[in-house]
C-alpha cells in the first residue's frame, strides 16, 4: 500500500456500503416497475446503462454503443465531415435555415436610389437645374409703390452683378420723407409714405381719418412739430388742438377730458346717476 493514500475509517466504509445498498434497492424497484407496467424485458441483474437505452428507444431516441444519443432519423454530422467542409445535413437536423428576408424593393424613383435602381436617374434633375438657373432676377416681380410693408426682395439664384441690380421706382423714392425735428436714427431716416394718408382730410382737421407719423407706417397720430402747445403732453399744430380733442378744447377747464388724460367723451352730457366710473365728479 502506497504511503500517499489515506485508509478510510470503519465508519466511512459502513456509510459507503449503506449508500450503495440504498441505491441498489431503489434501482430494483424501478426495474420491477418497468417490467410490470412498461413491458420492458430486463434481466434480473441488469446494468443501468441498458435500462437507459431501453427508455430512450421507447421515447424515440437512438443510443449507439459508444453512447451517442440522437432522435431517430436525425443523425448529426460527423466531426470529420465538418472539418472537411461537408454541408450535407440530415433530414431532421436541428439546424434551421433562416427565413427569407422580408425585403420588398420600393418602386423605382428618379431622385432616390432604390434596390432595383441603386444609382437613381441623375439625368432627370438636369432640366430642373437648368430651369432654375435660367430664371434671372429680372423676371421675378418687384413690389414697390404705395405699400405699408417693406419691398419684397426676390430670392436670387446666383450672386447679383452690376447689370442685375434693380433700381427702385422713382415714385417710391419720392414717398420717403426725413423729419426735421426727429432724432437721427435709421427708423426716421427712410420712411415710406402711408398710402392711406389723405392730405385733404388732414387740412380739414378730420380726426377720424388716418394720419402719418414719422418712423411709423399705418394709421397713427399726425406729425406735428414740437413747441406749439406747451400745456399738452403731445405737441399739436395750430388749429388742430380743438379738432383733435374729443369734444371742445375750450371747455377743458370745465372738466372736459383730453384724449391723453382719460376716456373719450362725446358732446352730449351724461347724468351723474348713469356714470360708471369709480369716483364721482362732484366729489373730485
Curated annotation (Swiss-Prot):
Region (Required for DNA-binding): 6-88
Family annotation (InterPro entries): BES1_N, BZR
Residue positions where Phosphothreonine is found in the record: 153
Region (Disordered): 1-21, 85-116
Residue ranges, compositional bias (Polar residues): 85-97
UniProt-listed Pfam families: BES1_N (PF05687)
Coiled-coil segments: none
Keyword annotations of the record: DNA-binding, Phosphoprotein, Transcription, Transcription regulation
UniProt keyword Transcription regulation, yes or no: yes
Post-translational modification: Phosphorylated. Phosphorylation increases protein degradation.
GO biological process, one term: DNA-templated transcription
Keyword DNA-binding: yes
GO molecular function, one term: DNA binding
Ranges of Low complexity composition bias in the record: 98-114
Signal peptide (from-to): none
Family: Belongs to the BZR/LAT61 family.
Protein name: BES1/BZR1 homolog protein 3
Organism listed in the record: Arabidopsis thaliana
Amino acid at each position: 500500500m502506497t504511503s500517499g493514500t489515506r485508509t478510510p475509517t470503519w465508519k466511512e466504509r459502513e456509510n459507503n456500503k449503506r449508500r450503495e445498498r440504498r441505491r441498489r434497492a431503489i434501482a430494483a424497484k424501478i426495474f420491477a416497475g418497468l417490467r410490470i407496467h412498461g413491458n420492458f424485458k430486463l434481466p434480473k441483474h441488469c446494468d443501468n446503462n441498458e435500462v437507459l437505452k431501453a427508455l430512450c428507444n421507447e421515447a424515440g431516441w437512438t443510443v449507439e454503443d459508444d453512447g451517442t444519443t440522437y432522435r431517430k432519423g436525425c443523425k448529426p454530422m460527423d466531426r470529420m465531415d465538418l472539418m472537411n467542409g461537408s454541408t450535407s445535413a440530415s433530414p431532421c437536423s436541428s439546424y434551421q435555415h433562416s427565413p427569407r428576408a422580408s425585403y420588398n424593393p420600393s418602386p423605382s424613383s428618379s431622385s432616390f436610389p432604390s434596390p432595383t435602381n441603386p444609382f437613381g436617374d441623375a439625368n432627370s434633375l438636369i432640366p430642373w437645374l437648368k430651369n432654375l438657373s435660367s430664371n434671372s432676377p429680372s423676371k421675378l416681380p418687384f413690389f414697390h409703390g404705395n405699400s405699408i410693408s417693406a419691398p419684397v426682395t426676390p430670392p436670387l439664384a446666383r450672386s447679383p452683378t452690376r447689370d442685375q441690380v434693380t433700381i427702385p421706382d422713382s415714385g417710391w423714392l419720392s414717398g420717403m420723407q426725413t423729419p426735421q425735428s426727429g432724432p437721427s436714427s435709421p427708423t426716421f431716416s427712410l420712411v415710406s409714405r402711408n398710402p392711406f394718408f389723405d392730405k385733404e382730410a388732414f387740412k380739414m382737421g378730420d380726426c377720424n381719418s388716418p394720419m402719418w407719423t414719422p418712423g411709423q407706417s399705418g394709421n397713427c397720430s399726425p406729425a406735428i412739430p414740437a413747441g406749439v402747445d406747451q400745456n399738452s403732453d403731445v405737441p399739436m399744430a395750430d388749429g388742430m388742438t380743438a379738432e383733435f380733442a374729443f369734444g371742445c378744447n375750450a371747455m377743458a377747464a370745465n372738466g372736459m377730458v383730453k384724449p391723453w388724460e382719460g376716456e373719450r367723451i362725446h358732446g352730449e352730457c351724461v347724468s351723474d346717476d348713469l356714470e360708471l366710473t369709480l369716483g364721482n365728479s362732484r366729489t373730485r
